[in-house]
Amino acid sequence: MSMNLSQMDIPQHLGIIMDGNGRWAQQRGLPRIAGHQQGVQAVKRTVEDCAEIGVKILTLYTFSTENWCRPKSEVDFLMRLAEEYTMQELPGLQRNGVCLQLMGSREGLPVSLLDILDKAALQTKANSCLNLNLALNYGGRAEIMDAMKAIISDHQQGNLEVSQIDEATFSHYLYLPDLPDVDLIVRTGGERRLSNFLLWRAANAVFWSMPVLW
């Protein structure tokens, strides 16, 4: 996928639903994993482009909670691909001033991947050109449910009164509490669905579906 955001108003927070890797591979008679490998190259270009044109926050829908239903071989490959991307791109992220963060549930993710992501987050946390959020093992409903459970727990422990619960308080319990609402959500592949992406933070977002495959 190639994007040219320089000709439109630059969003502060851009979310991308990266769709179409499998179809890209199928059209070329290749296995699905070839599409995922090609998709990583699109990620690299997109991160560089966003850093260059002034996008401050980029959230990529990397692996949804629903993706666990895919064949185990494909899931295992995607986890390894996430590890390889993080390790290989870390020098470039540092060079471009990119801060990398995991956005999603840690439960069920490989320990090796979590270790790599944690180290990358620590090494890049001082970077301020672009915040790159990998929505990995992420689902909008799961995020809201986890926030609700944490709020109930704090209330039961006497740390939070019902009168204190408002939108700002609720947002504080989401995966990345300081993350602002998303301004623009781009979905490649032609589908016109949010697919459980950034449900709480997409209240006022513009949605743009592109026919091009990721």
Per-region residue spans from a language model:
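Flexible, compositionally biased loop and terminal segments
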Residues: 1-214
